[in-house]
UniProtKB/Swiss-Prot annotation:
Annotated GO MF terms: hydrolase activity
PANTHER family: METAL DEPENDENT HYDROLASE - RELATED, MYG1 EXONUCLEASE
Record's protein name: MYG1 protein C694.04c
Signal peptide annotation: none
Native species: Schizosaccharomyces pombe (strain 972 / ATCC 24843) (Fission yeast)
Classification via Pfam families: MYG1_exonuc
Amino acid sequence: MNNLVKIATHSGTFHADEALAVYMLRRLDRFSGAQIVRSRDPQVLDSCDIIVDVGGKYDGIKYFDHHQREFNDTFSPKYSTRLSSAGLIYKHFGREVIHAVLPQLKINEQDLETLYEKVYQSFVEGLDANDNGISAYPAGLKPSFKAAMSLPEMVSSFLPAWNSEKQDDQTYLECFQKASDLMGTWFVRSVEHYALSWLPAKTLAREAILKAKDSPILIVDQFFPWKGHLFDIEKELGIENQFKYAIYSDGKAWRVQAVSIDPTSFTCRLPLPEPWRGIRDEKLSELTGIPGCIFVHASGFIGGNQTFEGALEMARKALDFPQN
């Protein structure tokens, strides 16, 4: 560990983006234990090893500021959100940081790229947008409530109070370090979730989809969160809208679920037949001609059967139902 290594960022009010940027750098061996220098003095900044969110320069090596008039860099061409210092550091060092957070992780290059982008998309991009004043929603929409506990607002809560007697640089540095640790805690949790839970689930979902071949029925024969992956994998494989129903166990019985038109919609590609909706147990079995029926939801988005074979038959009959 080299105690002379210095990470510089600006003095004064701090924000979530540089708090995370500094945390990510400090996870790397070459910046582990680095001194944090908070200044706007060009000579002080230039004496440091790496400079984030200040300095008016970006070279991808030492200088990582995004405030220049001409700066319009994004994470990749598919993104429109301009990078903040968090996105800049993640873009250049994110793969290394992931390995530093999870040194035991055995992962191939393709999965690393998937994880690298997912963490940006789900965690870092929101900080980039916030720091650049980009709203997630169109202007003019009136929010239903005030969400006062976003990460940027949590970071702001570490700033010394306006009427505090302690307004010196050392106090601000100590507060910044606490804010950086907070951002690091949530960043690590995000990386762990996507690496250890989300990515393995995507692998299983892909296997189930490939096993289905050209069938419109997806069979999920073990428990894992598959719904969020279905649409991405369909798109990756060029088979959008192939699946109409998914069969899976709820631990006691089997469910047949109509696939929605997109991940956030309640509208289904092919709801279960209207005459089945709201009917239960023996009446439903008599109506469908399928033993073991438990229910069909009133909206037709899901139904249940006591056996896998029964749930599968419900899906098959629903596909052939004339009113659908």
